[in-house]
Regions:
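Active-site metal-binding loops of divalent metal-dependent hydrolases
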Residues: 18-20, 130, 179-181, 260
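Structured beta-strand-rich core segments of catalytic domains in phosphoester-bond hydrolases
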Residues: 44-134, 246
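Acidic/histidine-rich helix-loop elements
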Residues: 12-31, 72, 100-103, 131-150
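Metal-dependent phosphoester-hydrolase catalytic domains
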Residues: 1-5, 162-176, 182-269
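N-terminal, active-site-proximal structural segment of metallo-dependent hydrolase catalytic domains
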Residues: 1-61, 72, 76-78, 121, ...
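Active-site environment of divalent metal-dependent phosphoester hydrolases
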Residues: 22-25, 52-56, 75-77, 133-136, ...
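His/acidic metal-ligating clusters that form di-metal
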Residues: 112, 120-126, 144-178, 190-193
Length: 269
């Protein structure tokens, strides 16, 4: 049970998305991130921007969590691992793929199929850091045009993996997709995702936080609470009932990164 954020009544699963910002200051924030994860007590955490400094979290949190997709199949570093509570779940399968359309190899998605050790229920989590085009990439392309096209393909790539998992485990497999999508709620890529999955902020039955700008620029910088919306999302399919959708923006939450964590409390149908 979380010390800071008690679970909603009836919660079966708490899932978080967390971009930890891999700038040089990460080495100083690793202990803060570890403490925050312990306090939030999520069952599954989809992470982004986990460089080699950030992998220290795997050892620090090893008493409670196991990491999936620390590397890609070819042995190269994966920046989008998934953490899961090994006391509750067994890993059925997992892996990762670089996004087909990207500027750097930091943009990928990972996946994990987990089984509840007590109930035998299986569910899948996919986790992405979607494409963005920045000036430093020195590409003859814009983030608004080509970048959005890339992000649209990133979404399609994840939906292809989701469909593969449906074929293997059945159409009733609960699926959650976490991540930094680098797109606002009205972006084309998010619109595409919403045609196939539900934004947890839209379907939460008890409470939600829709308008908090989940990206806030620098660790410790207060968030804008309206007028921009999030770029970090958790999407679910019909077999996941979302109770609460949360974008914490208190001092502890904004200190760990330039992104607020996003988490949901949910049940699996």
């Amino acid at each position: 049970m979380s010390k800071l954020t008690p679970r909603a009544n009836g919660t079966e699963l708490r899932v978080m998305s967390s971009n930890i910002l891999f700038e040089k200051c990460l080495v100083d924030r690793v202990p803060l991130i570890a403490d925050y994860y312990r306090d939030c007590a999520a069952d599954v955490i989809g992470m982004q921007e986990v460089n080699r400094v950030g992998t220290a979290l795997f050892d620090i949190l090893a008493d409670g969590y196991t990491a999936v997709a620390k590397t890609h199949a070819d042995g190269k570093h994966c920046f989008t691992p998934i953490l899961y509570r090994h006391d509750r779940f067994a890993l059925v399968e997992g892996g990762s793929e670089l996004h087909r359309m990207r500027a750097t190899d930091t943009k990928s998605f990972s996946y994990a199929v987990l089984e509840d050790k007590e109930t035998g229920k299986k569910f899948a989590v996919l986790n992405t850091h979607s494409a963005i085009i920045l000036a430093c990439h020195k590409l003859e392309a814009s983030n608004a045009v080509e970048g959005e096209q890339w992000r649209g393909d990133n979404v399609l790539q994840m939906l292809e993996k989701r469909d593969e998992l449906y074929q293997k485990y059945g159409q009733d497999l609960p699926v959650l997709i976490t991540g930094d999508f680098n797109a606002v709620p009205t972006g084309d890529s998010i619109t595409t995702m919403k045609q196939h999955m539900h934004d947890s902020a839209d379907v939460a039955t008890l409470s939600n936080e829709k308008n908090v700008c989940s990206y806030h620029g620098r660790p410790g910088t207060p968030c804008r609470l309206e007028g921009c919306g999030p770029i970090d999302f958790i999407f679910v399919n019909d077999t996941v009932k979302v109770l609460t959708h949360n974008v914490p923006h208190d001092e502890a939450a904004i200190a760990i990164s330039d992104h607020c964590p996003v988490y949901i409390d949910a049940t699996l149908n």
